[in-house]
Amino acid sequence: MASARDLRRRIKSVKSTQQITKAMKMVAAAKLRRAQEAVEAARPFALKIKDVLSRVAAASGGASHPLLEEREVKTIAYVIITADRGLCGGFNANILRRAASEVRDVNNPAIVAVGTKSRDYFTRRGYDITASYVRLGEAIQFSQAKEIARFVIDKYVAGEFDEVHLVFSEFVNILTQRPVKVKLLPVETPTEEKKGPQVEYIFEPSAEAVLAELLPTYVETTVFRAMLEAKAGEQGARMTAMDSATKNAKELINKLTLSLNRARQAAITKEISEIVGGAAALE
């Protein structure tokens, strides 16, 4: 049985850890609110861009564009979005597990790592990292997403990538983050027919010109939304993990305190027994 001194030292250590995890939970909760607001603001815009893209593509009469061009697939690129840090439960592990299952059977996949965890994971497993974007900060900027999108667009247009996929964690709620894969390039335009009266649009200077401007914006917006979803999921997972760690620390403190009380009681009982034994010996 541990001594009272050892138990006091352990209780002090666990209390110190509990204070840290509690503070991290509060910080994650504050960041989560901001990240969640950003996701909720970005989703309608991304959906509207997709809707407009489908209308313009239909109006253009099947106009050709490099970002719509499907060709023989030789090189597949994966933009894999993770966090830069850990302490967020299984958030990173779930994304990396999904990404690993996607690239496992692909010959020489091009890895575009967004986040330190993504870069380090695939580097350790011998994959060549085509590009990495790490330490992007807590507040994701559109300029960061635009840089990543422009990189894969240039590679796709140059013929170095034949397909590009996004692998990230879609934010469902605080407790649920769902790893998903989304095809980014070539851009797939929805062809489903709308019900009800249709609105006829006039495009200036032409539907083809609007499409040429809209396609890169659509790719940039899709990457931006994925990064925002991943950031919200990271903070939600971290808040949940730190809340669980704080509760576990409390339970451990209670157990250690009980052990300390028992150790004290045993020591007192032993002292009383020694006193009684000594008194009996003097009689």
UniProtKB/Swiss-Prot annotation:
Know the name of this protein?
Answer: ATP synthase gamma chain
The gene is: atpG
Disulfide linkage: none
Task: Provide the alphabetized UniProt keywords.
Answer: ATP synthesis, Cell membrane, CF(1), Hydrogen ion transport, Ion transport, Membrane, Transport
Q: State if Lipoprotein is listed as a keyword.
A: no
Q: Name one GO biological process term.
A: proton motive force-driven plasma membrane ATP synthesis
Keyword NAD annotated? no
Q: What is its main location?
A: membrane
UniProt subunit comment? F-type ATPases have 2 components, CF(1) - the catalytic core - and CF(0) - the membrane proton channel. CF(1) has five subunits: alpha(3), beta(3), gamma(1), delta(1), epsilon(1). CF(0) has three main subunits: a, b and c.
Task: Report the protein's function.
Answer: Produces ATP from ADP in the presence of a proton gradient across the membrane. The gamma chain is believed to be important in regulating ATPase activity and the flow of protons through the CF(0) complex.
Q: Which family does it belong to?
A: Belongs to the ATPase gamma chain family.
The subcellular localization recorded is: Cell membrane
**Native organism taxonomy:** Bacteria, Bacillati, Bacillota, Clostridia, Eubacteriales
| Native species | Desulforamulus reducens (strain ATCC BAA-1160 / DSM 100696 / MI-1) (Desulfotomaculum reducens)
Give the Pfam families listed for this entry: ATP-synt
Q: Which GO terms describe its cellular component?
A: plasma membrane; proton-transporting ATP synthase complex
* GO molecular-function term, one example from the UniProt record: ATP binding
